[in-house]
Amino acid sequence: MPFQDAIYRFGPFELRARTRELYKNGVRLKVRPQPLQILLALLARSGDIVSREELRRLLWSAETFVDFEHGLNTAIKELRGLLNDSAGEPRYIETLPKLGYRVIVPVTQVAPVHAAKAKEKNATTPAASVAVLPFVNLSAAPENEFFADGITEDVITHLAKMKSLKVISRTSVMTFKKRDRGLREIGERLGASTLLEGSVRRAGSRVRIVAQLIDCATDEHLWAETYDRDLTDIFAIQTDVALKIATALRAELSHDERSRVGRRPTDDLAAYELYSRGRNWFHQYTEEGYLRSLLDYHAAVDRDPGFALAWASIAGAHTELCIGGSVGKSPEEAIALAKKAATHALEIDQELGEAHSISALIQFAFDFDWAGAERSFLRALELSPGSAQAHQHYGWLCSSLGRYDAALGQLRRARELDPILIPTDVVTHLLRAGRIGEALEEARKSAREQPGTPRCHSVLGWALIFSGEEAAGIASLERAVALSPGATLFLSQLGQACALAGDVKRAREILQQLCDRSMREFVSPYHFAYVYAGLGEADAAIDCLEQAFDRRSGAIYGIKGSFLFRNLRDHPRFKSLLRRMNLS
């Protein structure tokens, strides 16, 4: 590459040779010509020694009368000041007595045509955005798959603590586990300008991890490293990978952020493996997955009672079971267990964003402490600004309070971080806000992109119904039921839709199915309320809502603006229930 056309990147800096411009984190620095010329010469021969005599010839012609020694020393001193470097403990430029100088930091050299394309390509994508693709399991034992997935998620979690980075969430990156698309296409789909990919090979007490960071627009390798370590070093490896990514993307980290990234979740490797396996079960997002995750999470805290992240995850699993209306035990017992686990997690670690986030969800979903929940969400997002789930749940709180613009802002931020798996929340809250046309457009898009996801067909069904396409809406709700035959949530919504369409016979048949199911297992009274509301039986519907309130079952916190209970809003008993929930 011609010297005069080069673009050099090192640490947070970028030097553009053609325009003679030096940038730090995207901000142009003022620099005199001589220090800039020296920096260009050193970067062009990164790692090599450039003698003082070579620099003299570069800066001053033989005919120029100047105190060369003083002039060069002054220029080097200015340069170190610009880079915040030290002669005694150099990070960028090393002095070799009687020999010269050399650059000791990794330098990336980019062709300007590629840089221009990258700039054009990423005009709407933040420069510091990264998606961590699932690490490939190269171990002989296929059961180590959960271990590789755990490393993927932990690196994402570390990066999500950095305010200056946009980090795509686990749920979205896991859809590309099979690598059936090119890196550039994956980056476009995820809205990320860079991708981290890697592999994990575990053998006995040793682990080999290979990681590389790639620019989606240019296919340039921004950073790569191989770690051959003892398994006990796994946490140090994860931290190092996260910090190296931050450096490569020129992300500025505060002291507190760096400290949080370096914190070990547990000193017990076996507890960590149990936790990782439980996390894999949790991410199935099914009743069985939540219940099985609890077994592994509890086994993890049995080994290490101080494992705060595992306690927060126990709280999360119980909470998801309660809100979904399928708890495997009484809602009261599950809620008590969730609260106890969340409280214990915070007692262990007050700076764990996940613990504040799940505590916030418990505060508003079960205690109706809206102000306390909002404070907890704000703290969670301060500690983990890249948490899609915290933004998502905060959006639920705002929507429950009728703050629809704020809710949509949070949910759209969540979707930026989790572009694959959070389309339906936006549709739901557009419907709650009465923005039917926008909701229908979003719903159709989500159903096209995720045809196998029941919730996508559920929200599409309601968007169609409110748009006047009743038959198409019911067909979409039937599709949701077919995709998730065990979920009473979708069945009960279908019952309401049938009742509203005048098919009372079918609505009552669905009501009977729910009754029959409730004889064998717990069915949330919240789901019965859907059907009764559709049938116009207001008192029966409110009876069920009051039972759901008493037992904190289902998504009772969202009833104020729910479009499924719109015909109950003027009922005195419904208004009384809202007052009991601090929603009047």
Short names for language-model regions:
Residues 5-9, 16-17, 21-30, 34-74, ...:
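Acidic, proline/glycine-rich low-complexity intrinsically disordered segments
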Residues 27-29, 94, 557, 566:
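Pre-signature/interface helix of ABC/ABC-like ATPase nucleotide-binding domains
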Residues 35-38, 79, 525:
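The N-cap/first-turn positions of alpha helices
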Residues 73-75, 80-116:
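Intrinsically disordered, low-complexity glycine/proline-rich and charged
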Residues 85, 192, 574:
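Hydrophobic patch in the ABC ATPase nucleotide-binding domain
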Residues 488-493, 521-533, 557-558:
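Amphipathic alpha-helical protein-interaction segments enriched in hydrophobic
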Residues 526-551:
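Sterile Alpha Motif
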Residues 543-584:
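C-terminal non-catalytic interaction modules
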